[in-house]
Amino acid sequence: MKKLLSLLFLVVVSVYTGYAQKITFSPQWSAQSQFAGYYAALENGYYAEAGLDVSIVHPANSYGSINMLKDGTSDFITCELIQAMMASDEGTRLVNLLQTTQHTTLVLIAHDKDIRQMSDLAGRRIGKWKAGFSEIPTILDKEHNLGIEWVKFINPLNIYISGAIDATLGKSYNERILFSMSGVIPGSLLRLSEMGYDYPEDGLYVSEKYFKKNPELCRKFAEASRKGWEWVRNNRKEAVDIVMKYVKETNVSTNIYVQKWMLEEVLEMQEDVKGEAPSYSLDATAFYWLNEVMLKHGYLSKPVDFQRLTGGKQ
């Protein structure tokens, strides 16, 4: 019976694929559980059912997903809200189709167990990514006159272990897990979301031009992607197996234990309120706060329009 159902599924998918719109999708990083919903949507045939022939192409470390959208390599991408807002401000107008992370995953991983609150960061040497993604921590530093000495890194683990810094920025679904898996036990861990600096991060984006030209196609891709994430939420073990397939295909150095832990954190950060089903919508209040603070500190030259960024759907 299972073989018959599998055969029927393949026949249906083949029929859909024959008339499908070809699409290239690029997540903002290498294969990992952060993008499990998109992998699941492809593997379970949700894109095919929507009449979409989707290829997933991961970016190179030195060439991000927004660049792939700009040069036409990709039709749909994921990126963080801050990067989408700054790109829009610089002339690359993006439209948010799905908001998959409602809270910031930024954390401060500290050596000293006495670093328990914001004021304890004053005058400390703290690592941050050379590639960026540190706008809000920098704003926090300025707004509270902490006088943090920022030290740029490529890999936070080595500089942290060396003792050259007092703490490092990291992601709760990534660096925090990697530190633990490497046997590094921090003295303390502070979440920016608990320090008054919470905001949405990952979302699904498309160029405004593509959105206006293909509104129905964009709707189908977003709905199929959401269906993929909903399946992942209810089938976590199987979802990690799918993630590991992409990990192996793209030769990413990780393991199933890291990806299991990562998936749990990613799914929790999708919830507007802990324990409730995700809305997958961009919260207007959080957006306007981010808009204001980024404008105030020079990361935007003008306010980003919420209705335009969300394609007028909110």
Label every PLM stretch briefly.
Residues 4-16:
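Sec-dependent N-terminal signal peptides
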Residues 19-51, 284-314:
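N-terminal hydrophobic or amphipathic helices and topogenic motifs
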Residues 21-153, 157-170, 192, 198:
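Short, glycine-/small- and polar/acidic-enriched structural segments
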Residues 82-83, 155-252:
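Pocket-lining segment of extracytoplasmic ligand-binding domains
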Residues 147-150, 187-189, 249-264, 301-308:
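Short, surface-exposed acidic
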Residues 214-297:
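Secondary-structure end/capping motifs
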